[in-house]
Amino acid sequence: MEFSQFKVNALMEITACPDLVFVRGQGSWLEDHAGKRYLDFVQGWAVNTLGHCAPEMKRALAEQADKLMNPSPAFYNLPSIELAQRLTSASCFDRVFFANSGAEANEGAIKLARKWGRVNRNGAYKIITMNHGFHGRTLATMSASGKPGWDTMFAPQVEGFPKAEINDLDSVRALIDAQTVAVMLEPVQGEAGVIPATREFMQGLRKLADEHGILFIVDEVQTGMGRTGSLFAYQQFDVIPDIMTLAKGIGGGIPLAALLAREEVCVFAHGDQGGTYNGNPLCAAVGVAVFDTITAPGFMEAAQARTRQLSEGLLALSAKRGLRGERGMGLLRALVLDRDDAPAIVEAARMLAPEGLLLNAPRGNLLRFMPALNVTEADMARMLEQLDGVIAAVRK
């Protein structure tokens, strides 16, 4: 079937898309309408924890679909209880609210913090966030984000999100006042160019929060569920946050997100928060399958081996091509280029024949890598070899 036969004009345009339609996927590979295969190192922007069409997920979907799909959040259902128990047992948090997207989870975190401020800090409502941070695309989460240009895109913004600089504790300290209720950040800023917070900064934020009686919120929408080498990124900094949000990898490709909080922060009254599909058993059952797979013996050790392979491969490529190194945590990594030709490299990689390569360029001088956590050693080596060839071809 030719691309021109697809009625793509029925879709509202929100981004520029190449002239291809993906029709199937398996593991680290996608196939388009013309039968061309692509090695996928984007995986839905770090969503597909187990790759495309993982058998564990398909099995969970089929089994749950045969039992119960959507009873309403007004009633308990078994998969949501089971997933909540797993998440709280594996973290420092006591309670979970399930949502459908990272933006919705972060919106919930903002509401929970503001409610806590009303109850415990005389109506404090300001949440300090970071320049270049990314928290979602609702009006409140766009306002919380520090993405350049977003302050005017749908003006006026939601008020109450002063911006500090990541890894600059003094910039956070200077913004704290009587109306401050929390500080919120991503442990690794993904859209900003895969910039990890330092251990000193994360521990300093926890100390600042304790000194001023405010909350410490981690947005682990992209970093959670094994992506950075531990189940949750905050665990690598030896800090205990008050609130955490998850999405992307928790569902492995199914719309699922979570807002987690410590008991003393759970101040929502009945009716303060809700949603039609929150805790949907079909999605939660898949979440259980993803959780059980990545916490099974040997899984994270294998992912850590692929992390070393990716990091060492990118460093070798950087040295060979005169680039500026690599950075990241776990299987969320970036190759820093010496010029702004990342978009051209992404396009050339996709156009490779007979099989393409899917990469991501959040910045003009940077490539981001977000493979499935179970990517094979052979596919990792193949990507590194293809990338070397593409960079050479683009820079002829």
Curated annotation (Swiss-Prot):
Protein origin, superkingdom: Bacteria
Q: Which residues bind N(2)-acetyl-L-ornithine?
A: R137
Q: Which residues carry this modification: N6-(pyridoxal phosphate)lysine?
A: K248
Output one GO BP term: L-arginine biosynthetic process
Asked whether the UniProt record includes Amino-acid biosynthesis among its keywords, one would answer yes
Q: How is the cofactor bound?
A: Binds 1 pyridoxal phosphate per subunit.
Q: Which Pfam families does the entry link to?
A: Aminotran_3
What more is known?
May also have succinyldiaminopimelate aminotransferase activity, thus carrying out the corresponding step in lysine biosynthesis.
What family is this?
Belongs to the class-III pyridoxal-phosphate-dependent aminotransferase family. ArgD subfamily.
**Protein name stated in the entry:** Acetylornithine aminotransferase 2
Record the organism.
Bordetella parapertussis (strain 12822 / ATCC BAA-587 / NCTC 13253)
Q: State the organism's lineage.
A: Bacteria, Pseudomonadati, Pseudomonadota, Betaproteobacteria, Burkholderiales
Q: Which gene encodes it?
A: argD2
